[in-house]
Amino acid sequence: LAHFDNREELARDSSGSEDARIASEVEQVLTEWAQSMGGFLRRLSGGRFLILTDEIHIRQAMEKRFEVLDKIREIKAGERRSATVSIGVARGAESLQEAEQWARKALEMALGRGGDQVAVKQKNDTYEFFGGLSKGVEKRDKVRTRVIAATLSDHIKESENVLIMGHRFS
């Protein structure tokens, strides 16, 4: 799953035609990337995309450190602002339903860490992260807070042992 992180911010700061150009370029880069991996892309809703490919191409993308993030950052709005995406990847799931759930969790994790990165959730319930080079703009809204709280709650429920401590003792 892929999410166009800063679409609203870029749209707010640009004209309608500029916004359409940026959104189109982001979708084009993602489409070409999916096709280069023998997969395909489908737009889901406002800035969200489903990308399907096979394991060998995911491994190759990981080896290249998901260079698609760099290509997306090359899409500029004005002189200083770049487009960014976050991607959630599932590896080793037993079914398509499980893969979708894992990809959603991975995407939430990438967004929770500031966006502009890829989070890969693997079979042993570990995550691997790529990207995150641009300075993330912290969004403090109710939806984001709820997503982070739900993700944290899921991790606590799935854990056998939970330790909570302050920074001084960690």
Label each residue range with its predicted role.
Residues 5-31, 43, 58-62, 139:
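Conserved long alpha-helical elements within nucleotide-processing catalytic cores of c-di-GMP signaling
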Residues 40-52, 77-105, 116-123:
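A short glycine-enriched loop-to-beta-strand structural element that forms part of the catalytic core
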Residues 62, 66-69, 92-115, 138-140:
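Catalytic-core segments of nucleotide cyclases and related cyclic-nucleotide turnover enzymes
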Residues 97-98, 122-156:
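C-di-GMP signaling machinery
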Residues 159-161:
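Pre-Walker A (Motif I) flank of P-loop NTPase domains
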Residues 22, 50-68, 99:
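Short helix/loop segment flanking the catalytic signature motif in cyclic-nucleotide metabolism enzymes
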Residues 26-38, 59-80, 104, 109:
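Alpha-helical scaffold within the catalytic cores of cyclic-nucleotide enzymes
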